[in-house]
Curated annotation (Swiss-Prot):
WD repeat placement: 10-50, 53-90, 230-262, 263-303, 342-377
Any Gene Ontology CC annotation: nucleus
Family from the record: Belongs to the WD repeat ASA1 family.
Source organism of the structure: Candida albicans (strain SC5314 / ATCC MYA-2876) (Yeast)
Free-text function comment from the UniProt entry: Component of the ASTRA complex involved in chromatin remodeling.
The protein, known as: ASTRA-associated protein 1
Keyword Membrane in record: no
Organism phylogeny: Eukaryota, Fungi, Dikarya, Ascomycota, Saccharomycotina
Length: 377
């Protein structure tokens, strides 16, 4: 049963991102289409701080080297210290609405040259940036220069997948791991064309060669990073991929239609009740919750929406008065692991949690009117 637990109201613009601090489960960051970020204390359900981090919609919030990272349509990626002062600003290409991905000290973004391609950066703890891969053409890797006939077209063809729409990193036990790369994850990229490509990033270790008999006389050889193709699926073609999720290490994808694909072997195709799948979230690794552009949230046989005051009786009038869903995420039980023995600060947080009856997991849904609703699951 999905029941409303509480509502967070401080944003004046459409909610664009919701991010739970992985270090402190009651510390929440929310962002909107104006570039404003609000830091919430969930134990009291009040803002602790807010700041104008960007000048346009925020597309990604994450963490790197224990610092908050944000990415916006204003063509910048920023890293913030504990006082929320910017310690590093990186120009980026945000012509599309794609997110970016962070894994360890690596940053994976749409290429600065071409929104269809990928760049990969390494950011060290001193905030030094190294570009490992530049303007990588995923289409060429998949098709090796071949031209693909567009489904539903007559004689026309294309030579790319269009812009990157969404990216998702999924840790997997099936990825081939060698002493050369130590990679245990797949980077899935969803495109405007409807194609989804899974890539393995290879980061070869530097080799040390002795050029003479003297063991102190050595040469360090750095080999280039590269991508290896692990997966390609075109079931969504010609509809753009707009959301990617993870179901027990298996990719799940949604598009502008009512089709959801579970990328198992063989794939499973689900026909949903509504088109325009805004978000898919994983609940307890074996269940999915779906959110749609029209504001509906679906969990199994349960379907709910948040309506504005009704002024009309027709279905068309009612649909116009439904809150539009803009972001959805889940706060999982695993995030409570940072609360250990009930001593000191953790004891205080546990007491506040008990008083406020804040029990995970919670589903958080952000809406076009700036409100964020928390649902018990």
């Amino acid at each position: 049963m999905l029941s409303t637990k509480f509502t967070l109201r401080s944003h004046k613009s459409s909610v664009a991102y919701i991010y739970q601090d992985p270090r402190t489960p009651f510390n929440l960051f929310t962002a909107d289409s104006s570039g404003l970020i609000i830091n919430w204390d969930l134990t009291i359900r009040r803002p602790k701080k807010s700041w104008q981090a960007h000048t346009d919609t925020i597309l990604t919030i994450s963490t790197i080297h224990n610092h908050l990272l944000t990415h916006s349509r204003d063509n910048t990626i920023k890293i913030w210290d504990e006082s929320y002062s910017c310690v590093l600003e990186i120009p980026c290409n945000a012509l599309n609405f794609s997110n970016i991905c962070i894994i360890y000290d690596l940053l994976i973004t749409p290429a600065s040259i071409n929104s269809n391609n990928l760049d990969v950066y390494k950011i060290d703890k001193d905030w030094q940036i190294t570009r490992l891969i530049s303007d990588f053409d995923v289409y060429k890797l998949v098709n090796k220069g071949e031209i693909i006939e567009e489904i539903g077209s007559s004689g026309t063809s294309r030579n790319d997948f269009g812009i990157i729409m969404q990216m998702k990193i999924i840790h997997t036990n099936t990825t081939t791991t060698t002493s050369e790369n130590n990679s245990d994850y797949i980077i899935y990229v969803g495109f405007e064309s409807g194609d989804i490509v899974g890539l393995q990033l290879i980061l070869p270790r530097a080799r040390i060669l002795s050029t003479t008999g003297n063991t102190n006389d050595k040469t360090l050889i750095n080999q280039s990073a590269k991508f290896i193709l692990q997966y390609h699926n075109s079931t969504h073609v010609p509809n753009p991929v707009i959301c990617l999720s993870n179901l027990d290490s298996v990719l799940v994808s949604g598009s502008t239609t009512n089709k959801v694909i579970i990328h198992s072997d063989p794939i499973e195709i689900m026909k949903m009740d509504h088109s325009g799948i805004q978000a898919i979230v994983n609940f307890k690794n074996d269940r999915l919750i779906f959110g749609y552009w029209n504001g509906y949230i679906q969990y199994g046989d349960i379907s709910i929406n948040q309506s504005l005051p009704k002024l009309g009786n027709t279905e068309q009038e009612k649909s116009k008065l439904t809150k539009k869903l803009t972001f959805m995420t889940i706060l999982n039980e695993s995030n409570q692991e940072t609360l250990q023995s009930p001593t000191g600060k953790s004891k205080y947080l546990a007491l506040l949690k008990s008083k406020r009856n804040l029990v995970f997991p919670l589903l958080l849904a952000g809406y076009e009117d700036g409100s964020i609703l928390a649902y018990n699951i």
